[in-house]
Amino acid sequence: MDSGKIYSGTNVENASYPVGICAERNAISHAVACGERKIIAIAIVGGANYSHNDFCAPCGMCRQFIREFGNPKEITVIFAKSVTEFKEMSLEELLPESFGPASLKQ
């Protein structure tokens, strides 16, 4: 967050799949509830069936949700398998030509 604080979130599965929430949106919602409004970076750790074979990337809904809280050129998305094995991309790379709050003012 722009404040330097770190917020964590977890994936919450539900028998009614649309009701579940991804860890990214969970963490951001927690941050917003605490007064935060600008994301500078988000780290995502995980993998299918708790496997560390693949990097875990945010789904499309989470990419758009992250986009609502900052400039996609300035938001760093960190994909981590471990403390030493990770990669970084900008949100702009993950969500090119995105629609955001400024789009509503045009």
Predicted regions mapped to residue ranges:
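Short, acidic, Ser/Thr-enriched surface-loop or helix-capping motifs
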Residues: M1
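Compact, glycine-rich, soluble single-domain proteins
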Residues: N11-N26
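Active-site- and interface-proximal helix/loop "cap" or "latch" segments in soluble metabolic
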Residues: E24-N26, H30-K38
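C-terminal binding/interaction regions
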Residues: E36-Q106
